[in-house]
Swiss-Prot record:
GO terms for biological process: translation. This is Large ribosomal subunit protein uL16. GO terms for molecular function: rRNA binding; structural constituent of ribosome; tRNA binding. Disulfide bonds: none annotated. Coiled coil: none annotated. One of its GO terms (cellular component) is cytosolic large ribosomal subunit. Belongs to the universal ribosomal protein uL16 family. Part of the 50S ribosomal subunit. Keywords: Ribonucleoprotein, Ribosomal protein, RNA-binding, rRNA-binding, tRNA-binding. It holds the Pfam family Ribosomal_L16. It comes from Endomicrobium trichonymphae. Binds 23S rRNA and is also seen to make contacts with the A and possibly P site tRNAs.
Length: 137
């Protein structure tokens, strides 16, 4: 499960996901990529499920890059607890993904297999996505 080794502060504000992604919007490593079309919090379990789906689909043929990392803690108060008395304890970690962000990249396999693998990975994520293909000039 992905999470930071150390953080300066245990708890964070929720924040807002306004606008489009500023960075990480184009393919940087691989030939094929999976791009987000909606703003969403993706937790570490969902990233891991998509990674496993990609790895099983491509077997030992290609290489996969994960371009997002869950570095935001999400807190939760215990069940049947009254309001107040401070913020709850961190429960899981999320990556804040805005529209346009490339989440996964891959290379080393044919285009049809890559698109099939990325489609399987996108089914594991709670978000609409688009498959990108690098145009070599």
């Amino acid at each position: 499960m992905l999470m930071p080794k150390r953080v300066k502060y245990r708890k964070m504000h929720r924040g807002r996901m306004k606008g489009k992604a500023k960075g990480g919007v184009s393919l940087a490593f691989g030939k094929y990529g999976l791009q987000a079309l909606e703003p969403v919090w993706i937790n570490s379990n969902q990233i891991e499920a998509a990674r496993i789906a990609l790895a099983r689909s491509i077997k030992k043929g290609g290489k996969v890059w994960i371009r997002i990392f869950p570095d935001k803690p999400v807190t939760k108060k215990p069940a049947e607890t009254r309001m107040g008395k401070g913020k709850g304890d961190p429960q899981f970690w999320v990556a804040v993904v805005k529209p346009g962000r490339v989440m996964f990249e891959m290379e080393g396999i044919p285009e049809t297999e890559a698109k099939k693998a990325l489609r399987l990975a996108s089914n594991k994520l709670p978000i609409h996505t688009k498959i990108l293909v690098r145009a070599d000039i």
